[in-house]
Amino acid sequence: MSLDYCLMVTGPAYGNQRASSALQFARALLECGHRLGTVFFYQDGVHNANRLSAPAGDEVDLVRAWHELAQQHQVALHVCAAAALRRGVTDALQASLLKRSGENLQPGFELSGLGSLVQAALGCDRFIQF
């Protein structure tokens, strides 16, 4: 039986295993034929959406890996706007409104509110936090 999943990632792209484990879990569930509708990045998890992240050559580039996963499997990547702005992650619209010189939100990610998280959680069979 195929299930619909929603993930919430609260770990940063680098510094602990939560984001990496979430990505590996997402790949595994998709390989097993399940559906992943939404990944919501919250708290320090918003760092997974920072396109200016530059890992060492021998490290996995989690920001680009999430982007590729989303493109290949039509997964929505939502980033908590309030948490992102507190941590210096912004899109062009917010940068303009806040009079910042540029944006750094990786293409494929979308700033959204907790309402998006609630909608995703209510619409899936399994909700898992990393």
UniProtKB/Swiss-Prot annotation:
Keywords: Cytoplasm, Transferase, tRNA processing. Coiled coil: none annotated. The active site is at C80 (cysteine persulfide intermediate). This is Sulfurtransferase TusD. Part of a sulfur-relay system required for 2-thiolation of 5-methylaminomethyl-2-thiouridine (mnm(5)s(2)U) at tRNA wobble positions. Accepts sulfur from TusA and transfers it in turn to TusE. Heterohexamer, formed by a dimer of trimers. The hexameric TusBCD complex contains 2 copies each of TusB, TusC and TusD. The TusBCD complex interacts with TusE. GO terms for cellular component: sulfurtransferase complex. It comes from the Bacteria. The keyword Signal does not apply. One of its GO terms (molecular function) is sulfurtransferase activity. The keyword tRNA processing applies. It is an enzyme of class 2 (transferase). Belongs to the DsrE/TusD family. It is found in: Cytoplasm. Its EC number is 2.8.1.-. Gene3D superfamilies: DsrEFH-like. SUPFAM superfamilies: DsrEFH-like (SSF75169). GO terms for biological process: tRNA wobble position uridine thiolation.
